[in-house]
From Swiss-Prot:
Disulfide bonds join C41-C114. Immunoglobulins are composed of two identical heavy chains and two identical light chains; disulfide-linked. Residues 1-19 form the signal peptide. It holds the Pfam family V-set. Residues 45-52 are annotated as: Complementarity-determining-1. Residues 77-114 are annotated as: Framework-3. This is Immunoglobulin heavy variable 3-13. Residues 53-69 are annotated as: Framework-2. InterPro entries: Ig-like_dom (IPR007110), Ig-like_dom_sf (IPR036179), Ig-like_fold (IPR013783), Ig_V-set (IPR013106), IgHV (IPR050199). One of its GO terms (cellular component) is blood microparticle. It is found in: Secreted; Cell membrane.
Amino acid sequence: MELGLSWVFLVAILEGVQCEVQLVESGGGLVQPGGSLRLSCAASGFTFSSYDMHWVRQATGKGLEWVSAIGTAGDPYYPGSVKGRFTISRENAKNSLYLQMNSLRAGDTAVYYCAR
């Protein structure tokens, strides 16, 4: 009986310290070519400021495509396909990542995800 109680107690402790990484995107919508959209990503379950963050996208029937990244110090990186049109930013105090997308094209149509 004592062993069983110890096991249950150990499981309870482990569950209590478990944290779940969550990344929740918002801000998408329909827009005409040439228009703009701003995406947001709310992060939780980890020390946001300690990680480089990324945006990736997936068009229907295609694989994942890297869209942008931002370092812990705020330094941005872009592939040529979006450079000059997309701007990544972060707000560490709010555990938030953003993607401002301007001069949108039909080829930008995709599901966008933030990633750690």
